[in-house]
C-alpha cells in the first residue's frame, strides 16, 4: 500500500466548505460523456450488424478474414487515434480535439451506413476507430482538468458508465433494427444511429469552453478565471484557491524547467523525470490489466457464447445480448456513488478480487460443459461415407468430444438424434452451419441422413446456460470498478505538461492489449480450451490485484496538481512542497496587490 502524508500544492488550506455545483458543470459533464457513449456504441454495434452483413448485397462474399478485419480494425485504429490526440490536444486544445472527434464519429457512421462494398465499409470502420481513440484519451483529460476536485472522480467514472450505456443501446438498436429488412436496411440503420449523438456533442462543444489549465498554460489568464467562475458557480473563495493552485503550479514548473534546462520533446522529458515516468508506467499497466482481464473477449464474442447454449435465432441472440450488456451497465453506478466517499483503491481492489472469482466461475462453467458433452466415436466407426482425405477431416477426428470439436471453426459435431453419440466432421464448404463436407451429416443426397443432427456451434449438455450466467456475473463485477478506475486514475496522475502525452500512452496501451486479447482468444480456446483461456485471464488478474495493492496510490481528496507528488519519494516531495509554498506566497501577494489596486482606482473614480 502507498502511504502519503496530506499536503496542499499551494501551501494553503482549502476552503472549508464544499462548492455548490451549478447548471454549467452538469451541461459540461453531459456533453463530454457523450464521447464515452459513442466509444461503447461503435465498438459494440458491429456485433449485431455482423449477423447480417456477410449476406448483405454488395458485401458478399465476406469470409472469416474480412469479418475479423472489420471488427478489429477499429480497436487497432483507436490505438493510432489515441496517440495522435496527445500531441494535438497540447497544441490546439482539448476542446478542439473533442470537436474533431465528434465530426469524425459522424462521418464514420454515415460512411458505414452508406457502404456499397467492403472497402467503403472498411474506411468507415477506420474513421470510427480514430474517433474512438480520440474520445477515449481526451474526454477523461478534459473532465479531469475542468471538474471541481470533489466530483472529479465521479464525473470521469460517468465517462466509463456511458461506455457501458453505449453498449446497451447498441444491442437494443441492433435488436430493433434487425426487424427492418436487416440484410438491406437494418444493418445500415445500426451504424447510422451513432451520427445523432455525435452531432449533439459537436453542437454542445461549439459553446463550451476550453479547460482552465490548458488556457492558463497557453497564456489566457483572463479566460482561465472566467471558466473557473462558471465551474465553481461564482464561489469566489474556491475560484481564488483554484486560480492560485494553477498559477503556482505553472510558475513552479517553469522554474524547474529553467533549472533543469528542460527542452526537447515531451516524451524525452517524461523519460528524464522519474516520478512522472513511474506514474506513466503505472497508468499504462492499469489500462493493460483492464484488457488482460478478458473484458473484450466477453463483449466481442457474446453472440458465440450465447449460441453455444443452443440459441440459433439471430433475434433471440441479440436480445439475450441486451440482458448481458445491462449487467455491464449496472456495475458502474457503484464507483460513481462511492468513489468520493471510500476512495479509488478500495473500489478497485474490491472489483479486481471479484473479477478473479467470476473468471474462475466462467472457467468452471465451460469445464462442466466440456465434460458433459458427448464423446466422439472411435475412428473405425465413422462408416463408409466418411472420406478422411477431405480437408481437415483427420484433424477433426482427433477431438475427443463435442465441445472440443465445435470450438474449432473447421469442424462440427454430427450425432445420432436418439443416442447423442456422434462424430467430429469437417464443416461443409458452402453451408458450414447446415452440413458437413463428408460423413453422415453431408448433403450428398439432398438431406442429412435419417436420425442424424449437425451442430456447428454448440453441444447438448445440461450445463449450456451456465456460461451465460457466469458471464453476467463477470460483467457485473468487472463494471463495478475495473471498467472506470483506470480511466479515472489516468486523468489524475500526471502534471499538466505531461498529461496529454501520458494519457495518450496509457490509452494506447489499452487499445493494443484490447487488440491482442481479441485476436488471440479463439486460438487460445483451441490450444487450452475455453475454460483454460478464462483461467489464464484469472491468473493475470491476480497479478493486477497485487500490482494495485502495492503500487497504486489513493488520489481521493487531492487536487489534480497535488496528485503528481504522490509518485515522488519523500525528499522530492518535501522539496516540491517547500518550493510550491514559496511560489504561492508570491502569487497570492501579486493577486492581493492587484485586487487592492483595483479597489483603490474604483474609489477615485467615484
Swiss-Prot record:
Record keyword Transport present: yes
PANTHER family, per database record: PROTON MYO-INOSITOL COTRANSPORTER, PROTON MYO-INOSITOL COTRANSPORTER HMIT-1.1
Function: H(+)-myo-inositol cotransporter. Probably by promoting the transport of myo-inositol regulates intracellular osmosis in response to hyperosmotic stress.
Family indicated by similarity: Belongs to the major facilitator superfamily. Sugar transporter (TC 2.A.1.1) family.
The protein, known as: Proton myo-inositol cotransporter hmit-1.1
Transmembrane segments: 21-41, 64-84, 97-117, 119-139, 153-173, 189-209, 279-299, 318-338, 346-366, 465-485, 502-522, 532-552
Reported induction: Induced by hyperosmotic stress.
Cell compartment(s), UniProt: Cell membrane
Amino acid at each position: 500500500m502507498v502511504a502519503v502524508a496530506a499536503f496542499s500544492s499551494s501551501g494553503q488550506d482549502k476552503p472549508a466548505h464544499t462548492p455548490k455545483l451549478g447548471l454549467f458543470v452538469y451541461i459540461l459533464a453531459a456533453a463530454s460523456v457523450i464521447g464515452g457513449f459513442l466509444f461503447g456504441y461503435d465498438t459494440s454495434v458491429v456485433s449485431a450488424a455482423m449477423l447480417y452483413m456477410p449476406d448483405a448485397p454488395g458485401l458478399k462474399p465476406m469470409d472469416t478474414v474480412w469479418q475479423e478485419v472489420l471488427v478489429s480494425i477499429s480497436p487497432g485504429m483507436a490505438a493510432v487515434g489515441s496517440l495522435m490526440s496527445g500531441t494535438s490536444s497540447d497544441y490546439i486544445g482539448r476542446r478542439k480535439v473533442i470537436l474533431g472527434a465528434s465530426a469524425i464519429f459522424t462521418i464514420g457512421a454515415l460512411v458505414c451506413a452508406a457502404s456499397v462494398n467492403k472497402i467503403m465499409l472498411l474506411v468507415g470502420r477506420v474513421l470510427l476507430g480514430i474517433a474512438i481513440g480520440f474520445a477515449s484519451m481526451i474526454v477523461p483529460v478534459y473532465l479531469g482538468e475542468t471538474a471541481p476536485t470533489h466530483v472529479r472522480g465521479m464525473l470521469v467514472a460517468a465517462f466509463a458508465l456511458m461506455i457501458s450505456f453505449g453498449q446497451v443501446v447498441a444491442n437494443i438498436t441492433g435488436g430493433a433494427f434487425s426487424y427492418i429488412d436487416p440484410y438491406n436496411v437494418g444493418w445500415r440503420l445500426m451504424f447510422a444511429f451513432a451520427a445523432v449523438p455525435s452531432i449533439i456533442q459537436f453542437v454542445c462543444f461549439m459553446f463550451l469552453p476550453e479547460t482552465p489549465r490548458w488556457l492558463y498554460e497557453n497564456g489566457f489568464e483572463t479566460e482561465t478565471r472566467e471558466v473557473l467562475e462558471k465551474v465553481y458557480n461564482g464561489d469566489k473563495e474556491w475560484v481564488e484557491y483554484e486560480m492560485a493552485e494553477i498559477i503556482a503550479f505553472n510558475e513552479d514548473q517553469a522554474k524547474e524547467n529553467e533549472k533543469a534546462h528542460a527542452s526537447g520533446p515531451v516524451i524525452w522529458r517524461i523519460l528524464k523525470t522519474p516520478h512522472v515516468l513511474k506514474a506513466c508506467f503505472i497508468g499504462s499497466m492499469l489500462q493493460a490489466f483492464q484488457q488482460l482481464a478478458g473484458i473484450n473477449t466477453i463483449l466481442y464474442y457474446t453472440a458465440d457464447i450465447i449460441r453455444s447454449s443452443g440459441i440459433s435465432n439471430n433475434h433471440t441472440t441479440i436480445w439475450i445480448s441486451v440482458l448481458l450488456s445491462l449487467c455491464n451497465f449496472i456495475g458502474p453506478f457503484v464507483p460513481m456513488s462511492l468513489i468520493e466517499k471510500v476512495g479509488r483503491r478500495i473500489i478497485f481492489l474490491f472489483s479486481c478480487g471479484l473479477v478473479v472469482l467470476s473468471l474462475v466461475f466462467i472457467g468452471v462453467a465451460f469445464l462442466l460443459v466440456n465434460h458433459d458433452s458427448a464423446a466422439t466415436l472411435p475412428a473405425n466407426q465413422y462408416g463408409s461415407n466418411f472420406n478422411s482425405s477431405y480437408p481437415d477431416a483427420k484433424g477433426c477426428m482427433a477431438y475427443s468430444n463435442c465441445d472440443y470439436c465445435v470450438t474449432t471453426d473447421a469442424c462440427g459435431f454430427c450425432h445420432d438424434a436418439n443416442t447423442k453419440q456422434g462424430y467430429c466432421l469437417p464443416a461443409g464448404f458452402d453451408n458450414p452451419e447446415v452440413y458437413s463436407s463428408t460423413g453422415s451429416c453431408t448433403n450428398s443426397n439432398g438431406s442429412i441422413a435419417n436420425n442424424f443432427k449437425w451442430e456447428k456451434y454448440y453441444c447438448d449438455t445440461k450445463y449450456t446456460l451456465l456460461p451465460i450466467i457466469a458471464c453476467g456475473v463477470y460483467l457485473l463485477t468487472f463494471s463495478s470498478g475495473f471498467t472506470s478506475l483506470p480511466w479515472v486514475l489516468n486523468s489524475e496522475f500526471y502534471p499538466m505538461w505531461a498529461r496529454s502525452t501520458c494519457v495518450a500512452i496509457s490509452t494506447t496501451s489499452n487499445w493494443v492489449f484490447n487488440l491482442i486479447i481479441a485476436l488471440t482468444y479463439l486460438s487460445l480456446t483451441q490450444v487450452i480450451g475455453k475454460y483454460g483461456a478464462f483461467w489464464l485471464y484469472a491468473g493475470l488478474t491476480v497479478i493486477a490485484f497485487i500490482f494495485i495493492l502495492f503500487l497504486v496510490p489513493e488520489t481521493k481528496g487531492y487536487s489534480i496538481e497535488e496528485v503528481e507528488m504522490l509518485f515522488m519519494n519523500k525528499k522530492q516531495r518535501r522539496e516540491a512542497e517547500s518550493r510550491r509554498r514559496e511560489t504561492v506566497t508570491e502569487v497570492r501577494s501579486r493577486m492581493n496587490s492587484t485586487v487592492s489596486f483595483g479597489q483603490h482606482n474604483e474609489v477615485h473614480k467615484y
